[in-house]
């Protein structure tokens, strides 16, 4: 799946394809989350559009996926998530620890392997 993420969107901000990514009010939290798509779901959607099966695939990400992306990973049949351990160290807070902990439970129950590199 990694090659598909490179062509997922022309916007470095994750704007949905065809949507302007230069509107200031769309770049500020929390509103920006209504206008963007995370890399994980972008990769899954692009695989679907290209007719590429994701069943049994591995997805490579910088940090633990959010719960929305994690559910998409499971539903897409992806069986392994590879995470950049060094980058994850930057996301240590009560909020992230709790959120990513729930994602780990979801992956464990769905039998999606997590590998930190």
Outline where the language-model segments fall.
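Zinc-dependent deaminase catalytic domain
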Residues: 1-117
């Amino acid at each position: 799946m990694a090659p598909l993420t490179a062509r997922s969107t022309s916007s470095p901000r994750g704007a949905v394809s065809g949507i302007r990514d230069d509107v200031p009010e769309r770049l500020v939290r929390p509103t920006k989350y209504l206008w963007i798509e995370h890399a994980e779901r972008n990769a899954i959607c692009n695989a679907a559009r290209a007719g590429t099966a994701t069943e049994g695939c591995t997805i490579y990400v910088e940090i633990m996926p959010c719960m929305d992306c994690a559910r998409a990973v499971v539903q897409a049949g992806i069986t392994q998530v590879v995470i950049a351990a060094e980058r994850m160290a930057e996301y240590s807070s009560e909020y992230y620890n709790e959120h990513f902990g729930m994602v780990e439970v979801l992956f464990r129950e769905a039998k999606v392997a997590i590998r930190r590199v």
